[in-house]
Amino acid sequence: MDWMPLVLAAEEAESRGFSLNLNLLETNIINIAIVFGLLIFLARGYFGRVLGERKSEIENGIREVENRGRQAEQELATARQNLSQAQVQAQQILASARTNAERVRAQVLDQAQIDIARVRETVDQDLRNEQQRILTQVRLKVVGDALARLRERLPGELDEATQRRLLDRSIQLLD
């Protein structure tokens, strides 16, 4: 390449000062336009395809996110419904447990009252039996003591009729 014309042109420009070169061929505007035109013409298909693929990926991503959002909303609604059902069921279980507890409490109290009455009756019966036994022992002791004193005091003085009267009276006292 010959640099000489460029050097001469630069020297001439320096001698004239600063100026605007309006020669289109010298300024390479046409060359740049041709390069850009070819670049656009050749790269348009490639960039169109790349941008189309990118647009398609973005649209698919948006659809997928929207689907996930709808699915999450459905799962949330299902979870809320399940929670509501669980709360209702828990309330029913608590109410049932309270009812059962009250019923069992009433049964236990009733059974306790029955048991207390039965124990009292048994204690009263045992007390009456013990009183009767003690009373019988006391009567026997009194009769035995009375007979012993009579035997000491009246040896040979009692006839058979008097002994019979004493025995009958002693038997009446026992009843």
UniProtKB/Swiss-Prot annotation:
The keyword Cell membrane applies. SUPFAM superfamilies: F1F0 ATP synthase subunit B, membrane domain. It is a single-pass membrane protein. Its main location: membrane. It is found in: Cell inner membrane. Belongs to the ATPase B chain family. F-type ATPases have 2 components, F(1) - the catalytic core - and F(0) - the membrane proton channel. F(1) has five subunits: alpha(3), beta(3), gamma(1), delta(1), epsilon(1). F(0) has four main subunits: a(1), b(1), b'(1) and c(10-14). The alpha and beta chains form an alternating ring which encloses part of the gamma chain. F(1) is attached to F(0) by a central stalk formed by the gamma and epsilon chains, while a peripheral stalk is formed by the delta, b and b' chains. This is ATP synthase subunit b. The gene is atpF.
